[in-house]
């Protein structure tokens, strides 16, 4: 990994590491940069965390990683950032002459990342023909570099994983690899334990929550606020709670104030468990996602997901009108008006909520750590043959 910070990919890594360790595997986590101390404390005691000397291709990093592979007797390396060629290149040289297999994972929608999306945002804001031409050229260059980097990682891995069956064709189209025999689908697990939680609808509060980073490039939390602005007066006994932080938080708080919203709370970064236990609905209005981990986290506590269908993997998780709501993706952009109409189906009908919540919990069980480990174990066994 490049980093071991507080984020979805890192949390998945720590949960899987514990599961692998609990199943009698020697597990270590290695990252290029210094790991976040809180993440290290949250990591299973049986799992060692190593760091290299910054994200770069250097003989020092190669030597340090090779020492780890040999001293820890590593058989399989899981590259949790299956895009940059630098990590793959360091690993390729470090494992030379060793019997080490490599699994690479891309944790997003192939063909989409923050750098490409930033250019698209700039492009949408300008009418200047010359600037548009420059930005289109820049976007195409980024796409070319990204696709070639992804191809490099694929070619230097024994298995390459994506998070959804719907991403297989997108991977093929984006990389130009028409017959990717090493490609497979591996979904993420629920990363929060529900403990002894039992759904009791009467204990659920009339609350919509957003959980996650607050930024514009990906999460677009302003859409949640826009939607809530159409609902607050009609449902004065409901509230919206934003759990998370990020570069756009100040702007989002100003937006809520400008709209005169009263029943909105900004909680900052918090453990989401207590919010999952009490809330009825979780909104996710991202412009793109890989998996949307918060969806299955919330679903495991009977929180009905209401999510923008901007990424194909959401349809693996949410069956619109059955275990949640999908706001249809539109080329002209997200419609707060249409989202508000769909949300009211749950907000004013307890029976609808109760049914969806039960089905959401059942869906979340497919993503339990135990179930996900079984599929990983099958992959490990295939690589060992």
Q: Which ranges hold each PLM region?
A:
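Short His-centered aromatic/hydrophobic patch
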Residues: 79-86, 106-109
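N-terminal strand-loop element at the rim of the active site
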Residues: 2-7, 13, 19-57, 167, ...
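Short hydrophobic beta-strand element within catalytic cores of glycosyltransferases
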Residues: 304-308, 318
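A conserved mid-protein helix/loop that constitutes part of the nucleotide-sugar donor-binding site
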Residues: 10-15, 206, 215-230, 247-253
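Aromatic "clamp/platform" in nucleotide-sugar-dependent glycosyltransferases that forms part
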Residues: 287
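A short, active-site helix/loop in glycosyltransferases that binds the activated sugar's phosphate group
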Residues: 139-182, 192
């Amino acid at each position: 990994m490049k980093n071991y910070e507080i984020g979805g990919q890192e949390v998945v890594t720590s949960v899987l590491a514990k599961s692998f360790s609990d199943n009698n595997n020697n597990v270590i986590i290695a990252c290029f940069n210094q790991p976040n101390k809180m993440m290290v404390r949250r990591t299973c005691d049986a799992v060692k965390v190593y760091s290299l000397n910054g994200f770069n291709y250097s003989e020092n990093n190669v030597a340090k990683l090779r020492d780890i592979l040999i001293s820890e007797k590593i058989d399989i390396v899981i590259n949790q950032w299956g895009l940059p060629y630098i990590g793959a290149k360091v690993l390729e040289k470090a494992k030379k002459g060793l019997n080490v297999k490599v699994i690479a994972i891309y944790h997003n929608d192939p063909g989409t990342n923050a750098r490409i999306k930033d250019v698209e945002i700039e492009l949408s804001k300008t009418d200047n023909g010359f600037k548009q031409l420059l930005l289109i050229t820049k976007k195409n260059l980024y796409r070319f570099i990204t696709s070639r980097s992804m191809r490099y990682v694929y070619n230097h891995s024994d298995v390459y994983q994506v998070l959804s069956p719907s991403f297989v064709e997108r991977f093929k189209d984006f990389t130009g690899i028409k017959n990717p025999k090493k490609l497979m689908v591996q979904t993420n697990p629920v990363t929060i334990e529900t403990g002894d939680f039992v759904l009791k609808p009467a204990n659920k509060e009339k609350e919509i929550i957003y959980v996650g980073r607050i930024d514009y490039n990906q999460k677009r939390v302003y859409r949640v606020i826009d939607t809530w602005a159409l609902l607050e007066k009609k449902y004065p006994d409901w509230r919206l709670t934003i759990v998370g932080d990020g570069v756009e938080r100040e702007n989002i708080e100003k937006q809520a104030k400008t709209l005169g919203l009263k029943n909105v709370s900004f909680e900052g970064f918090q453990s989401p468990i207590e919010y999952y236990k009490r809330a009825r609905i979780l909104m996710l209005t991202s412009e793109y996602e890989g998996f949307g981990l918060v969806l299955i986290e919330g679903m495991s506590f009977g929180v009905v997901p209401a999510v923008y269908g901007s990424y194909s993997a959401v349809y693996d998780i949410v069956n619109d009108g059955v275990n949640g709501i999908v706001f249809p993706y539109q080329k002209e952009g997200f419609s707060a008006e249409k989202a508000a109409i769909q949300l009211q189906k749950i907000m004013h009908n307890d029976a609808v909520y109760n049914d969806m919540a039960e089905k959401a919990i059942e869906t979340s069980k497919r993503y339990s750590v135990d179930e996900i480990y079984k599929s990983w174990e099958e992959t490990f066994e295939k690589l060992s043959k």
